[in-house]
Structure formats: structure tokens, C-alpha cells
Amino acid sequence: MAQSINITELNLPQLEMLKNQLDQEVEFLSTSIAQLKVVQTKYVEAKDCLNVLNKSNEGKELLVPLTSSMYVPGKLHDVEHVLIDVGTGYYVEKTAEDAKDFFKRKIDFLTKQMEKIQPALQEKHAMKQAVMEMMSQKIRQLTALGAAQATAKA
């Protein structure tokens, strides 16, 4: 369990360390959300592609991707069944409707994960802002103290 720290009791180097830690946490959470969005977009695109599979397109010629930049000609033979990548190199044959349901569940799961991360990211942003404001306040205090000492010596 995380312990609560009163930032008013920390000195400038400690505040700087805390700010750096919060920067890293914000970066990690932001990257996590971005990665989840990329995966979610791929699932949305895959689900949308299933809408092209219908009886009127059966027998039509198409380009089949072998890699991200290499395609070979092919014919759409079976519009009722598809192979979907379920991860780690495994593919499963499903009906087009089952595949749409699979992608919908994945999209919903990723949305929920992003919704769980978002509040933590906002909390870290707020904490970082509070630390930066405290640092500014301490710097102003030190500057004022230094100016007061300089005028007292003069």
C-alpha cells in the first residue's frame, strides 16, 4: 500500500526526485493507453472488414496479404467462415458472425482497460502539478530569503 507524503515537508531535491518519479509514471500510463488504443484500432478495423464478406462478393478476386508489404492475388471462396488470429501465432476458424462477436468482446475489454487506467493517469498528472507548484513556492521563498539577507548585509 502506498504511503501518503506531505509535500510541504519535502525539500527541493526531494521534490525534484518525486517529480521525476511522477514523470516516469505518467509516461508509462500514457504509453500503456496509447498501446491499448493501437490494438483496439486493429480490432475495430478487423471487425469492419468482416462487413465486406457477403454472398455478393463471393468469387471475386482480391489481394491477399502475405506480409505488411507483399500481396498475392486470390479469390474470395467462402464468405461464411474466417480465420482469426487469437494470439501467439494461433488461428481459429469461426463464422463471420462469431468473429464479429469475438472482435466486439476484445474492443469492449480494451475500452474497459483504458477506462481503468485513465483515472490513475489523471491522478498522477494532478500530483505532478501539485509538486511543481510546491517547488515554485519553495524557490520563491528561497529567493525572497536570499534577497532579504542581501539587503540586511548592505
UniProtKB/Swiss-Prot annotation:
GO molecular function: unfolded protein binding
Subcellular location: Nucleus
Gene3D superfamilies membership: 1.10.287.370
Gene Ontology annotations of biological process type: protein folding; RNA polymerase I assembly; RNA polymerase II core complex assembly; RNA polymerase III assembly
Superkingdom assignment: Eukaryota
Record field: transmembrane: none
Cellular component terms per the entry's GO annotation: cytoplasm; nucleus; prefoldin complex
Residues recorded as bearing Phosphoserine in the entry: 56
Keywords: Acetylation, Chaperone, Nucleus, Phosphoprotein
Residue list for modification N6-acetyllysine: 42
Location of N-acetylalanine modifications: 2
InterPro entries for the chain: PFD_alpha_archaea, Prefoldin, Prefoldin_subunit_alpha
Family: Belongs to the prefoldin subunit alpha family.
Subunit details: Heterohexamer of two PFD-alpha type and four PFD-beta type subunits.
Protein role: Binds specifically to cytosolic chaperonin (c-CPN) and transfers target proteins to it. Binds to nascent polypeptide chain and promotes folding in an environment in which there are many competing pathways for nonnative proteins. Represses the transcriptional activity of MYC.
Protein name, entry field: Prefoldin subunit 5
Species: Pongo abelii (Sumatran orangutan)
